[in-house]
Amino acid sequence: MKCITKEIAERFLAEEFDIRKYVQIEDAAAEILAKYQWPLNLRGLTSLSEKAAKALAKNQWLLDLCGLTSLSDNVAKALAKHQGMTLILEGLTSLSDQAAKALARYPGSLFLCGLSSLNDQAAKALAKHRGELFLTGLRSLSDQVAESLAKHRGGLCFYLASLSDRAAKALAKHQGILNLPVLTSLSDQAAKALAKHQGSLALGGLTSLSDKAVEFLAKHQGELSLSLTSLSEKAAEALAKHQGLYLTVSCVENLSEKAAEALAKRQGSLLLPLARFSDKAAKALAKHQGFLSLGSFVTSLSNNAVTALAKHQGSLTLYGLTSLSNNAVKAFAKHQGSLRLDGLTSLSEKAAEALAKHQGSLSLWDLTSLSAKAAEALAKHQGSLHLGGLTQTSLSDQAAEALAKHQGELHLGLSNLSEKAAEALAKHEGPLSLDIKYSLSYAAIEAIAKHEGVLSLDFCSLDDAGAEYLAKHEGDLSLNGLYSLSEGVANALAKYKGGLSFGVTNLSDKVAEGLAKHEGDLSLNRLCGLSEEVANALAKHEGDLSLNGLAILSDKGAGALAKHEGDLSLNGLAILSDKGAGVLAKHEGDLSLNGLAILSDKGAGALAKHQGQLHLGCGKLSEKIVQILAKHKRLHWTKVTLPPPSFVF
């Protein structure tokens, strides 16, 4: 049998190759592979010793063990201590009550998609899990199991073919994301029950619903996603009253003018991935005020539809359009608000001149080439300019010089950057973001570091010497393309005098200690896991600390971060335990928990005693919890602006 030996593991870390063909692993090899700082795919393994499981649990990324068809209780206990945020055990066809109890302690996303049935004891155990739980192998739920799993606090995903009224009533008590993507039918009573669910609700498999069922679901208070092929005027009128942050209605084959008029009255973001719609429907939708996305299915528009949509006031997204006539470009240039035409792959000089007159944020994300003349035209645009697709070809030095004259936020996606282009872009006045496909030369880094203001460099590698150059930059610096940091880079950038932002998803103790020496704002918003040691190190950082990528925070981690002197942002947390709320309430700076959606009465009472300013997201918490938190003397409710929901945890 093919076995991962110590030698094979060492070679894998050195040069990386496909190790999915191996069915066994030595304990010593597991210790080595645990150090791998990327998702670890070991789906070929058919068996795993307890010692190997304990070793692999130290891995801080995704761990894929979907080749395992069974799991001993001790191995389950070991894997539950996995330090990464995703554990995939899709091959398991059965699970003992003790193994379920053990895995429930795992705080990250847990995939148990191979389970086709679940007894009530196992369901009760898994209900105590606090991350995202995928049980897509279950095609049906008994009423008892549904009642047990409804107590789960976090995302739930089932591939249920049917749902009884009683089971729907039980699941409605669940708090968090509830995703039922293959459910094809839903009774009016079941819809009435699910409308009471607190959290995001995705029903992507339902192609038809009665008007009564739609009316019930429209009363749902969270984000709602439906995939209806037809929508009556009455149903549209009901959905227009939906008060959640986002409403998605996809797959409607022929949206009538009346239905469009009704939907346009909705106050809030509206996502309508439509394949086609009439000119009259376009005219009606244009009256919607706010975020309007017509998705990627709309690949062409009539002149009348363009004229109508151009009058829309608010954010407009049409990323299915791959080309536009000159008249269409001129019309969209008059649009008032953010405009995303991310499907366009090319742009003539004439079209660039027209779009440059648009006032507001302009995104042409899929543009793969840009002439110097077109760049010169776009540089006259007043507002944020996003050109992220220029990674297929090199941006000429002339085009870089032209774009550098743009006044406002400039976001470019490039394959590389010459020293001359870097020198030109360094003169840009305004926030500058560069997504670099490959690494930069020292000369280019030294040149771009002279940019005055906010600088974002999204590239995947940086050595100590490059970090020394960047440390001389004056202004906030974002390096969100770096998924890992060496101790040398961390120590070099710790000398940086402005705000720092990194895209790392995990940190070693030593790197955390290095970053903690930085004096200024520190953002680690993609950090998905936090050990107690790292939390203790970061707590010593002097300046505001942002950890918005953390979806789960242990009580010990919360206790450590509570000692941080400065503002603390944990906007990714949807759930907070009573103990976690109690220790965070002792934090002496401002505390931001805008994503918090699940909190007990006791936890709310604890947070209400927090002395600094407390930021919470509007519409996230129940009315009862809001009343308890109202006792906080410096409570600030924030209108949460998030990207459109994908409903894929």
PLM feature segments, named:
Residues A34, A53-A57, A76-H82, A100-A104, ...:
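A structural signal for leucine-rich repeat
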Residues A14-I25, Y36-L48, N59-L71, Q83-L95, ...:
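Concave beta-strand-loop units of leucine-rich repeat
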Residues M1-N41, L263, L285, L403, ...:
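N-terminal segments that cap or nucleate solenoid repeat domains
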